[in-house]
Amino acid sequence: MDSNTVSSFQDILLRMSKMRLGSSSEDLNGMITQFESLKLYRDSLGEAVMRMGDIHSLQNRNSKWREQLGQKFEEIRWLIEEVRHRLKITENSFEQITFMQALQLLFEVEQEIRTFSFQLI
């Protein structure tokens, strides 16, 4: 994985974990958990692409990997909408910057997962 992407994930997760958004802290914790899950999934797809022979083991291990891929794209879309919503309602510039960077990272990760998945198909 690109070292910039790693540091972007780590930076955004750290900053999001420091935010306190009132009664919506559970929602924020859910977003953080989904970001972490998305990062792990992206990493595993990237590793499978790097070892192209693993496509068969990936398919054997999880015969529903295409379905899982679709679910990940749904999660990304949900996160994008949630981050956009947070961006609209927050007035704190630190939070605005964090959510703008999170949104940019989500778009990048979505594109990377699409690229990896096309290579695996």
UniProtKB/Swiss-Prot annotation:
It comes from the Viruses. SUPFAM superfamilies: Nonstructural protein ns2, Nep, M1-binding domain. Gene3D superfamilies: 1.10.287.230, S15/NS1, RNA-binding. One of its GO terms (cellular component) is host cell nucleus. Its main location: virion. A motif (Nuclear export signal) lies at residues 12-21, 85-94. InterPro entries: Flu_NS2 (IPR000968). It is found in: Virion; Host nucleus. Coiled coil: none annotated. GO terms for biological process: exit of virus from host cell nucleus through nuclear pore. Keywords: Host nucleus, Host-virus interaction, Transport, Virion. Belongs to the influenza viruses NEP family. Interacts with protein M1. May interact with host nucleoporin RAB/HRB and exportin XPO1/CRM1. Mediates the nuclear export of encapsidated genomic RNAs (ribonucleoproteins, RNPs). Acts as an adapter between viral RNPs complexes and the nuclear export machinery of the cell. Possesses no intrinsic RNA-binding activity, but includes a C-terminal M1-binding domain. This domain is believed to allow recognition of RNPs bound to the protein M1. This is Nuclear export protein. It comes from Influenza A virus (strain A/Tokyo/3/1967 H2N2).
